[in-house]
Amino acid sequence: LLAWGLTLGLAVGIVSAQDKLFSELVGPGSVGAVKAGGALQVPFIIWGGDMATFYANGGLKTKSGSIFQKQGLNLNLTPGDDFIQQVRDYRSGKSPFLRGTYRMMGQASEVIGSDPRTKGVMIMQMTWSAGDHMVAREDVKTVTDLKGKTVAVQQGGPHIGMLDDVLKTAQLDWSDITVKYFSELTGDGSPVEAFRAEGSTISACFAVTPDMFGLCTDLNG
């Protein structure tokens, strides 16, 4: 995963495939400067690699004697799985950082690339590790079976690009499926919970590894 601002054109097809442009999801807002002094707001995400971040910081706020404190850092770690809100916070100056995948940054480029004050620079790639899955019902034997089906995914999240890759692999277009977007990555209001719901018409959903295990355990009885 990445901490940075702008990538150029990595997800033009993905952005146009959503029901709304990413800029419409983010909405209007003014560009603000990051306040000098005090703790820097850094978003964290549901990702195993962030264990190192929490360990080095000593928790959500930089703890005295922690690795980051000894390096002169003062950080406030805040939830960042709502990437649309992350971009709003970045634009307004609440945080100088964006956290996400390459494809998520491609979506954000529409917003942050529109003003020279918010154009970002990639400063770190944290991990290459996997942890994302598409879980499907029994009638979806191959990815080509997704045609005509309903697929659930978090809007603006890390799985938009993965869904795009799956469709390309199956030689399908976004118009070949019905996409249901959800605000949360996991828990209430997420694709996983919608997929799990009794009587759900969703044929496939995207999930992080713990949710995938939960779904597959349920499906196998």
Task: Indicate where each model-derived feature is located.
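Composition- and surface-driven signal marking solvent-exposed, interaction-prone regions
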Residues: L1-L2, A56
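Sec/Tat signal peptide C-region and signal peptidase I cleavage site
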Residues: V12-A17
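Short, glycine-/small- and polar/acidic-enriched structural segments
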Residues: Q18-C216, N220-G221
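Bacterial N-terminal signal peptides
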Residues: L2-A11
